[in-house]
Amino acid sequence: MSAKWEKKGANDGELTFEIDLDKISEGLDVAFKRVRKNINTPGFRKGKMPRQIFNKMYGEEALYEDALNAVLPEAYEAAVAEAGIDPVDQPQINVEKMEKGEAWVLTAQVTVKPEVKLGDYKGLEVPKQSRRITIKDVEQELETRRERQAELVLKEDAAAENGDTVVIDYAGSVDGVPFDGGQADNYSLELGSNSFIPGFEDQLVGHKAEEDVDVTVTFPKDYQAEELAGKEAIFKVKIHEVKGKELPELDDEFAKDIDEDVDSLDELKEKIREELKQQKNDAADAAIQDTAVAKATENATIPELPQAMIDEEINSQLQQYLGNMQQQGINPEMYYQITGTTEDDLKKQFAGDADKRVKTSLVLEAVVEAEKIEATDEEVAAELKSLAEQYNMEESAVRSVLSDDMLKHDIGVKKAIEVIADSAVEVKDAK
């Protein structure tokens, strides 16, 4: 194999390579076995024509196209490896020379991964993160957990307030015409939850059970049902019940009820403090990581990105998002129907920062190379086990989707992030 790479632009060039006689012979054998199955020749059973007879009747050249298709993928892959390039798209291949008894010569117009010139990526200044947990933080979390244990109690002859739950019938219309999804009976709605159209819940505040209320609202201009977007609607609402929250007492019994690992309210508060501390530390570490990696990306010099890389990133984000929906039991068709969106809408959404994500990935890969980062077999095994547990899959199933090289790449990128983040310096007034 002989391969030559000639750079033409920032991210593209021409790869010239040869297919030697041995490989050509292998390809011709494959091609002949394929075509002779369908040849009827007087004096021979179908599919049994000798090679010499075929060559005499049709010429060996008749096999060249099929032979090339048989050996080209391996030959191109070998040429790419020899030239040391990293293609990001399907090449445009041309045959330059294809003569009997000589090596075949081909050229491929190839788009390659941009060459990244790293700037500063260690010791970067990042804003100092707060990791302090206050008494107020603990009290707010305690109150949140208390709210979760609240019971709904019927409010007799009392006006509804924000935070109350009302049981209602409603029927909506636009210009006097009912619309799909605009009616329901005995619907429980928490006022102030903002789960209905803006303004709907506010107009029920102050009303009592057994009252009839006309609620007038305007659908948002970006409402998912286009036929309703921006239009005024009137809802006839009947309030059946008004229920208020009855909160449990904050005492030792409450603590033991919601957490079997504690015996008192003080123990619960201490446990909450430790949990909040861990959450705040994790959030601070993530903020440092995000800021430092973003700065490292800004400091790097990266040529204009090939569109193929941006498109691949958009499709990757799309598949990941839809995959997450599938895990929740929502297939793509159902998701598009529920949200009133299309695949193109999602692609436009992910296209917004696709360029930034690709550049970040390129910089992290460059750091892996600069730092000579490698993943051990033990780390690959641990990553495989972690992914299997995360997605509730057998390790063999994960391995069928992710090769060792892919796992090593992901581990290397994680280590590169650690190199950047661990060396970052927290500064109070960092920009």
From Swiss-Prot:
GO terms for biological process: 'de novo' cotranslational protein folding; cell division; chaperone-mediated protein folding; protein transport; protein unfolding. Its EC number is 5.2.1.8. It catalyses: [protein]-peptidylproline (omega=180) = [protein]-peptidylproline (omega=0). It is an enzyme of class 5 (isomerase). Signal peptide: none annotated. Keywords: Cell cycle, Cell division, Chaperone, Cytoplasm, Isomerase, Rotamase. GO terms for cellular component: cytoplasm. Coiled coil: none annotated. Residues 163-248 form the PPIase FKBP-type domain. It comes from the Bacteria. One of its GO terms (molecular function) is protein folding chaperone. It is found in: Cytoplasm. NCBIfam families: tig. HAMAP family: Trigger_factor_Tig. Belongs to the FKBP-type PPIase family. Tig subfamily. Consists of 3 domains; the N-terminus binds the ribosome, the middle domain has PPIase activity, while the C-terminus has intrinsic chaperone activity on its own. Involved in protein export. Acts as a chaperone by maintaining the newly synthesized protein in an open conformation. Functions as a peptidyl-prolyl cis-trans isomerase. This is Trigger factor.
